[in-house]
Amino acid sequence: MSKIILLLFIALLAQPVAAATQGKIPVRAAYSSISGAGIVTWIAADRGLFAKNALDVELIYVAGSQAMQSLLSGTTPIGIQGIEPVFRVNAHGSDTVMIFGLVTKPTFSIMVRSEIKDYHELKGKPLGVSRYGSSTDLLLRMSLEKWGFKPEVDVPILQMGGVPPILAGMQSKKIFGGPLSLPTLARAKQEGYRELVDIADLIPDYQVAGVVTRRAFIKQSPEIVRGFVRAMAEAIAVFKNNPEAVRSVMKNRLKIDDPAVVEETQKTYPKYMPAVPYPSRPGIAVIKNSLDKTEPALRPLSIDDQIDNRFVREMEESGFLNEISRAK
């Protein structure tokens, strides 16, 4: 089974998409999550929502910290990622900014092998995260601290390369568990792994993913940015209202066709996605407070300098968000 998970993961990496539509503005966009955030992005592509906004978007999967490197290099000048790398690169003089809050609640559960009955039993047992510095890493460390552990001292943390590889690591017994999100989370439950905690019960606010770009790109190409966020906003509505659209993306893009997994993903994720997708200040504050403990260079940075609400505010005030709320 671990080989199957890894093969599916590799297959997803290998499939960029180009909506080669005449008269559209070409742009490459990165997404760094094979979960609800990634599904929304594929809905925007497959349902023609980018094209509807005059964009010819090529979606490229870029994992973890590499997504920020791709953005800074200009390879993918806009994309979906977390707020953590925004703080880190801006501390060194960059101008990155989150302009759209896609997922504003923790979407992960800490899943463990069946022999682990309680969090007290985690001491000395390695757990996996996608990549160091990612949301899985920070959320796991914050959870361990709430349980009284010193991360890496009491509980080893291994970098696995993505969320599906965390499950693969549990299957191969390389690790005892780690944070998983849908649809991988549903598969883990089906296979008998234990849900130790829904992280949202420990950490209710957390800016998991959003649309990130550079202020220079906003100034240079405001219509691309505007069209991108409008497409993403409508894709969220489609995700919430059209189970078939979710099923299609999961089957054709993620190669997942298990009805139970698809249904749980479609029913669960909407509660993590705000109707008015501003980046979550409380969710960002939680992250910054945690980062400040170990990364002193980030302490002088303000939350306001890491976000730009103009495009969401424009959609809200124009009535666009109400217009698309029933989109299918």
Regions inferred by a protein language model and the residue ranges of each:
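Pocket-lining segment of extracytoplasmic ligand-binding domains
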Residues: 84-85, 164-255
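Basic/polar N-terminal segments that are highly enriched at the extreme N-terminus
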Residues: 1, 16-22, 328
